[in-house]
Every structure is written in C-alpha cells, then in structure tokens.
C-alpha cells in the first residue's frame, strides 16, 4: 500500500552519492582550529575518534555508557564537575555518533578559560580511563540511557526514527535487546572504552582581538 501511494511521486534517477571516507582513528597530533567572531561567549568543541568502535561492534554498549558517564547526562562528569563544581563552562556535554565512531564534546566558555576548560575536559576523560567512576555515576548513566530507549516505545515518531537508523545501519536489534546489553556493561568495560577514545580535533570560537579583555 505504501509503495502504491508513493508511486505517483516524481523520482530523480540521476542521484549522485558522493564518496565518503570515514576515519576511525585519530592522526598523530590533534588538529587545532581557532576562529574569531563578534561574539560574547566562546565555544569549545572537541572531537574524539572511538578507535573503531561503532554500532556494529560488540563493545558498542560500553562506548554508549562511556559517553553517558563522560558528558551524555546531567549526572556526567562534564556537567557535574566542569560546569557545576568548577564553573568553567556555561554548558558542557558530549554526544556519540554511532556510525562514524565519534564522540563530540560541546561547551560554552569565557574566552580566557579556554586552556583551563580544555585541560579539565581531558582530565575528566582520563578519570574514566583509569576506572575512577563512582557507582552512582555508572548506574545513573545506565538508568538514563535505558530510560531514554524505553521512552521511545511510547512515541511513534521516536520509534520511526529509531528503526530508520537501525535499517540504515543494517541492524536488527530492538530496544529491549539493546537495554539488556546495557544492563550487563561493567565499570571496567566503560574504562576500556574510554581508553580507545583518541583526541582528533579541537575547535575554539573566540571574540575578535581586544574584545572583552
């Protein structure tokens, strides 16, 4: 029925799909990009390669929880420590791109706190690498991620988005199966996932020269 309903729509047969090469590992030295605009708040973004861990890999659930502990929830190290405790950022969070193997950190900072904020973000990641994860941090991350998946079951739009992503990736796991995988991830596995993260790029948006100095 769906094919029949869509059959009358015009289709462009001359579709060109550009070549795309996905790098799963970072270069020897991180790229550092700085830009200056007429802005009142600095932006610090940091991109990490997952060392080959994508949604097709067995250790992907551990990387999901690693990202959640790092900066993916309001109980994360970036939010609780870099933002709340140390007040180095107006906001700080991280997201995991499951198909390209990326963890992207985004934060808003004062211009003169660039180096301090950058170093502290890396220090928080090092804590995870060393297994310095409190039980409440891991369980809070686990409950938040699983709760987000389960909430999808009550929303048709989110279910459509979920299954579109699974179909594009060629994956068949449903939400209950993913939740079961997340339930068994240990603190040691999260630390091992963090050890695979490689800093690839740092981007700093600052004010123009002389602004707010």
Model-derived features: where do they sit?
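An aromatic/glycine/proline-enriched structural segment found at the starts
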Residues: 1-54, 211-213
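Charge-rich, well-structured scaffold segments of protease-associated domains
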Residues: 1-17, 84-213
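A generic short-segment signal for beta-strand/edge and adjacent turn/coil regions
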Residues: 11-18, 35, 59-61, 71-77, ...
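Signal/transit-peptide handling
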Residues: 37-124
């Amino acid at each position: 029925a769906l094919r029949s309903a869509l059959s009358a729509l015009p289709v462009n047969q001359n579709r060109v799909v550009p070549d795309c090469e996905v790098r799963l590992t970072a270069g020897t030295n991180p790229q550092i990009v700085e830009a200056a605009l007429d802005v009142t708040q600095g932006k610090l973004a940091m991109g990490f390669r997952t060392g080959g861990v994508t949604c097709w890999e067995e250790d992907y659930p551990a990387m999901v929880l690693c990202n959640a502990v790092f900066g993916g929830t309001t109980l994360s190290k970036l939010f609780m420590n870099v933002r709340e405790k140390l007040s180095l950022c107006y906001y700080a969070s991280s997201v995991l791109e499951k198909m390209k193997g990326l963890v992207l950190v985004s934060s808003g900072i004062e211009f003169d706190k660039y180096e301090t904020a950058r170093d502290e973000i890396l220090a928080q990641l090092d804590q995870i690498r060393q297994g310095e994860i409190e039980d409440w941090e891991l369980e809070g991350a686990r409950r938040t991620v699983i709760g987000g998946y389960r909430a999808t079951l009550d929303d048709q739009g989110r279910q459509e988005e979920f299954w579109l992503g699974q179909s594009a990736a060629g994956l068949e796991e449903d939400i209950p199966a993913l939740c079961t995988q997340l339930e068994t991830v240990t603190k040691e596995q999260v630390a091992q996932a963090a050890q695979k993260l490689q800093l690839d790029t740092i981007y700093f948006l600052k004010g123009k020269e002389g602004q707010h100095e």
